[in-house]
């Protein structure tokens, strides 16, 4: 019965009733804004690699689970504009407090740079599977007398959608109509984004699924196919330092996918010495999440999130778990807490 329930949710998703949730939901986007906004490609001074697994709606058979691998880095980046908290470069002077914040202003005389990256995303919900790969590019242009940067980026790739009939349980008599759901589709996807960021803030916007592809795995709805809607994201955040050891990082994410109502995430993180952090995230009339993590060193960081529904879904599951592991390559400045820490 639970399998049929999951399949019913899937069918809603491809016939338009539930298509507002086409893309997987992550609560660790605060540690990997690159997932949502291609303009962040190459924002750091190093290659940033992240691996994450999300198990959603525990307690429900065949519940959704998602996996992603992302990697991106800069090209010809000579300044340290990505870091709000970092160690000084060798041979440079600067005052370092307990937060390892370099008072010498790294956001002066910024230079333009580029970034490239890529990602692999897998999303599974019972018999329904989605596997995508994409590449991204961004250009970061100094503005405001070279004290801030305005970046614009694009992500382009392919996604394979499929439905495995062998994972369904319809009894001994399988309807021939149902058996047609054996097909798979390979569709292109493009997203564009922009971000304005400075030493203590960022604001950005993204439009995803620009192609608004039509998906019909059965081949039965030709001429009446429902299309994937555009996803619109607005995001912003800042940092508030509380002395030399503590800092607060509030942020917000606004999402709109027609015909669903606007979704708003309000987030707050607190960090101690830029090594240990915890936070909460609230999605209006949908879910609340608790987040925690640590920066082990200048190479490895880990984040964990537990999300609990506040909608009617709370009656059918025991929450969602998400684990993220990050690796940093080419970190010549030994940065332990980069710009994305405020997401």
Place the predicted regions along the sequence by residue.
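Sec/Tat signal peptide C-region and signal peptidase I cleavage site
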Residues: 16-20
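Sec-dependent N-terminal signal peptides
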Residues: 4-14
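Hydrophobic alpha-helical membrane context
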Residues: 14-15, 49
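Subset of outer-membrane beta-barrel
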Residues: 21-343
């Amino acid at each position: 019965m639970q399998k049929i329930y999951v399949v019913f949710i899937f069918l809603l998703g491809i016939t338009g009733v539930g298509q507002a949730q086409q893309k997987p939901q992550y609560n660790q986007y605060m540690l990997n804004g690159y997932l949502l906004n291609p303009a962040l490609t190459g924002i750091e001074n190093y290659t940033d690699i992240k691996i994450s697994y999300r198990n959603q709606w525990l307690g429900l058979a065949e519940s959704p689970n998602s996996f992603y691998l992302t990697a991106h880095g800069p090209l010809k980046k000579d300044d340290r504009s990505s870091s709000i908290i970092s160690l000084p470069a060798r041979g440079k002077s600067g005052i370092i407090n307990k937060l390892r914040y370099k008072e010498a202003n790294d956001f002066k005389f910024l230079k333009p740079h580029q970034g490239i990256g890529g990602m692999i995303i897998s999303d599974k919900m019972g018999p329904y599977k989605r596997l995508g790969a994409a590449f991204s590019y961004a250009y970061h242009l100094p503005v405001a007398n070279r004290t801030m940067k305005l970046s614009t980026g694009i992500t382009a790739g392919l996604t394979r959608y499929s439905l495995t009939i062998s994972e369904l349980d319809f009894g001994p008599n399988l309807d021939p109509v149902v058996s047609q759901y054996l097909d798979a589709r390979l569709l292109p996807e493009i997203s564009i984004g922009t971000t304005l960021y400075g030493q203590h803030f960022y604001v950005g916007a993204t439009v995803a699924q620009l192609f608004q592809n039509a998906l019909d795995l059965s081949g039965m709805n030709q001429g009446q196919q429902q299309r994937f809607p555009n996803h619109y994201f607005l995001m912003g955040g800042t940092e508030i330092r509380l002395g030399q050891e503590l800092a607060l990082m509030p942020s917000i994410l606004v999402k709109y996918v027609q015909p669903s109502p606007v979704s708003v995430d309000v987030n707050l993180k607190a960090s101690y010495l830029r090594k240990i952090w915890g936070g909460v995230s609230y999605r209006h009339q949908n879910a609340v999440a608790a987040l925690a993590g640590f920066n082990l060193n200048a190479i490895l960081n880990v984040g964990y999130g537990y999300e609990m529904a506040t909608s009617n879904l709370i009656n059918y599951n025991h929450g969602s778990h998400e684990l993220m592991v990050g690796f940093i390559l080419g970190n010549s400045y030994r940065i332990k807490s980069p710009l994305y820490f405020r997401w």
